């Protein structure tokens, strides 16, 4: 019996997942949609049995989510909740964009101080929740974080060498070893560079497909997010509108998680991710169709009234 030991979290999900971070990312992706059915289940006509099932399922997911010890997943779910707060506050999309730009400028000007604070943090990953959260910003001694920075540095060097078209789709895994620098290596680095990916959904296309790949990949995420918010605001049905919002929240968890890890090449993340993307787009198309139908009906009424 391992109980809830921290070290056991790294392989307790096997054979279904090969990594606890992928497991955490998948749960984070699903929690908002399941929460939707808990909140709006009665409006959807769910009986007592269905509601008990939803509550049980959500409780299991949250328990697994916490015990996954995936720091990136924890951060991503907080970001999704932030989206819910902002949307429910009825803040205009333009305002959000301006605020985001201002934050980017502030971070850019404060980058030296931020990195200095991160470098002073020596708290490693731990079974203690508070210490584990604190280790998120440890870029000096935490092996996982240091190795992540190593992979990112390799990706950026590969991009600098081939900025337009990159080194080719799927080639990062086979080539990054040659781009490793001794001062970037961690205790879990390998000389041959045979252990994986960029740890980023944004830097992988940048290194493999150049600037075009990064822009294309990011555009898909941004457009889907905008469509999700638009679907929420233009859909007349409260239930459909909130389904679009909670599906967008689920996707947001991975948009954020994608800065720190990269799992879309696996079926276990790709299926729920693109499934939620399809839900968001379908609701937006439905809302567009309803709007056009309403316009036609109004035109007919005007013509009839003129007669």
Regions found by a protein language model. Give the residues of each.
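Membrane-interfacial segments
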Residues: 39-43, 90-91, 118, 122, ...
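Short helix-coil transition/hinge motifs at the ends and kinks of transmembrane helices
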Residues: 41-48, 117-127, 138-139, 182-193, ...
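Peri-membrane helix termini and adjoining interfacial loops of integral membrane proteins
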Residues: 1-9, 76, 127-130, 182-187
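Hydrophobic alpha-helical transmembrane segments
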Residues: 210-224
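A juxtamembrane structural motif centered on a specific transmembrane helix
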Residues: 44, 51, 230-245, 251, ...
């Amino acid at each position: 019996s391992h109980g809830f030991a921290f070290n056991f979290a790294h392989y307790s999900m096997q054979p279904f997942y090969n990594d606890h971070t992928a497991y955490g990312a998948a749960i984070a992706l699903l929690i908002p949609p399941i929460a939707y059915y808990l909140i709006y289940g009665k409006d959807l006509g769910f009986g007592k049995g269905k509601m008990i099932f939803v509550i049980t399922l959500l409780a299991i997911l949250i328990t697994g989510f916490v015990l996954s010890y995936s720091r990136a997943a924890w951060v991503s779910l907080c970001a999704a909740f932030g989206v819910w707060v902002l949307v429910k506050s009825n803040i205009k999309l333009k305002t959000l964009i301006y605020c985001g730009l201002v934050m980017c400028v502030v971070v850019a000007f404060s980058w030296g101080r931020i990195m200095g604070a991160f470098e002073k943090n020596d708290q490693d990953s731990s079974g203690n929740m508070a210490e584990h959260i604190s280790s998120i910003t440890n870029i000096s001694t935490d092996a996982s974080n240091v190795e992540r920075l190593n992979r990112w540095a390799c990706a950026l060097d590969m991009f600098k060498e081939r900025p337009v078209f990159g080194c080719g789709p799927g080639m990062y895994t086979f080539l990054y070893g040659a781009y490793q620098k001794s001062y970037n290596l961690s205790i879990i680095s390998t000389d041959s560079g045979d252990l994986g990916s960029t740890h980023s959904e944004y830097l992988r296309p940048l290194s493999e497909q150049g600037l075009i790949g990064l822009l294309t990949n990011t555009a898909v995420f941004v457009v889907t997010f905008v469509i999700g918010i638009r679907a929420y605001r233009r859909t007349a049905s409260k239930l459909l509108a909130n389904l679009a919002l909670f599906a967008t929240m689920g996707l947001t968890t991975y948009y954020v998680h994608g800065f720190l890890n990269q799992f879309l090449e696996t079926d276990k993340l790709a299926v729920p991710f693109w499934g939620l993307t399809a839900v968001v787009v379908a609701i937006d198309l439905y809302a567009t169709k309803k709007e056009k139908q309403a316009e036609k009906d109004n035109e007919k009424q005007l013509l009839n009234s003129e007669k």
